[in-house]
């Protein structure tokens, strides 16, 4: 029997956390982990600038987290493989990104992402966090 490894997975139960940790270690000048499954810019912009946040499931890394950095996203909230992050995790990110200029939340048009975003925006509104939501069109990866 061969000992050749065919995958870069240590533990399937921890794949998302390990992928994000590895990504942050590989690009420390661009990103850091602010909390579990929350990727933010290594060098945040000022409170006078709108924070741009997005969310989505893992499984295509670096996927959305690959867009976190100067001139792009400020924060990416990552769910489990092919699953949206929960509303509480997104709300945690919105609290981290709260600033005077507000937050633009870019939501991919997948049912779980939309549901989590709607719930997190309601929680944010109750706390006085200014969030504007932008719903994008679906990509065609799910098939027609």
Tell where the protein language model's regions lie, with residue ranges:
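Solvent-exposed alpha-helices and their adjacent loops that cap or buttress functional pockets
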Residues: 31-32, 43-47, 53, 65, ...
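Active-site histidine-anchored catalytic micro-motif
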Residues: 98-100, 112-116, 128-144
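A short, small-residue-rich loop immediately preceding and capping a beta-strand
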Residues: 101-109
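Gly/Ser/Thr-rich loops at beta-strand to alpha-helix junctions
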Residues: 57-62, 79, 108-117
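Gly-rich Lys/Arg/Thr-decorated short loops/hinges at beta-loop-alpha junctions or inter-strand turns
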Residues: 1-4, 46-55, 64-77, 142
């Amino acid at each position: 029997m061969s000992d050749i490894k065919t995958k870069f997975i240590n533990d399937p139960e921890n794949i998302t956390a390990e992928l994000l940790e590895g990504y942050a270690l590989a690009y420390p000048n661009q990103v850091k982990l602010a909390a579990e499954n929350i990727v933010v810019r290594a060098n945040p912009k000022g409170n006078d600038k709108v924070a741009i946040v997005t969310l989505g499931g893992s499984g295509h890394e670096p996927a959305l987290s690959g867009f976190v950095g100067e001139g792009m996203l400020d924060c990416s909230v990552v769910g489990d493989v092919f699953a949206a992050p929960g509303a509480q995790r997104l709300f945690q990110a919105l609290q981290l990104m709260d600033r005077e200029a507000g937050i633009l939340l870019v939501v991919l048009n997948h049912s779980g992402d939309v549901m989590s975003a709607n719930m997190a925006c309601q929680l944010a509104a109750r706390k006085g966090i200014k969030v504007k939501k932008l719903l994008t069109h679906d990509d065609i990866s799910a098939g027609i």
